[in-house]
Amino acid sequence: MVGCAPTTTPASKFEPNYLYAHALGKLEDMVLDQPLDDTQDLLTEWFGTLDKPALPPLFAEDEYKDLLTLSNLEKAAGPPAKTAELGENGLYRQLCASCHGESGQGRGPVAASQNPYPREFRHGIFKYKNTPRKYKPTKEDIAKTLRRGLSGSQMPLFNKLTLEQMDALVDYVVFLSIRGEFERKLLYNAAYEMDLEKDRVYSVSFKGSQDSESKKKYESQMESAEEILTGIVDVWVESADSVEKFEMPDFPIYGTETDENRNQLLESIEKGKKLFVSEEAACAKCHGASGSGGGTQLPDYDDWTKDWTTKIGIKPTDTDLLLPLMARGGLKPQPLVPRNLVEGKFRGGREPLELYRRIRYGIVGAPMPAATVVKSSDEKGLQEADLWHLVNYVLSIAAPPEAAIETKALVASPLPKRP
């Protein structure tokens, strides 16, 4: 099994994913120390360090060169300014790392005290986005979360950042996500596709070797790694054009009604109310019949937690068995609390189209499933109009939005100094 995470990570080094490596090792009864070390060598070569980020060679190719820019990564990376004012670089460490962690591991110095915990970027999963379920968010989706914050959580809004600062932070979040997902898939590939007694994820000593056998092995390692990375980056590129357009219904949406069509809206709300508690929509199972969150569904956990608990056969409530995993980076599992829709605090936005997409696509990483959309009432599921009826009902029971808080670019508590 992989050893415990060190108390500190060497200056400028990303923290290895000890948690995932240990979970994989426990699940398959294998030792992943060498693959984890090999993975760090390749990650450093391709993605650089916390203070000096780099882009893998793949990003020089035409179809990928616009996804991330090194200049943006350099603005976000590195040590923060020594004053409360934002500097020319170090934006991520100054604004985000105290919660999300320097490596995007979701475990910054203040993370354990929060509920819900800050997002862990290394899975490559984002809950609030406008793209279909299988896609990544667009950059605008990430920027929108930064500008608006997440109501009902400790995620603040950063609505005073300049366009350049926002672009830098968004690029860096995507960078951390790609890097983290690449690390996970390298480890997964080592566990399930390699003979660890004979093969290595990456042999840095083979680089530049003139020995034919070493050269052959190195080329094979590079080919495998490039294939894995390309698969990850392709989804990000494809996601930029994946946002679907939906036609508005022929009845009014809550907040847009007029005296002439108000009765149509009331009819839609009533239909939405009935659908809300129906078996087809099943909203009430989690959100309760009144929408206040008191459903009958048993406590559940997000996919980040399940990744190192239920997926490897450990209950999230079995603290004794979880201690070795928590020592390697896991935070004590928190059961999810279904949204109290009556409060009107909608993470990810409360615009009708945003709520429609959330119902249609579900929330990736959370138990909320995608709707089963059908074309006729003869089929089991929800029709397009039903989704809009649900939107109208939810908006009708929700408290009005709170006034936006004007804020400067918020500065989180400073991180502890490196040893």
Where are these regions (language model features)?
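Sequence/structural segment immediately N-terminal to covalent heme-attachment motifs in c-type
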Residues: A81-G101, Q264-A289, T296-I314, L390, ...
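Electrostatic cytochrome c docking/interface patches
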Residues: L19-L91, K207, Q221-S278, S292-G293, ...
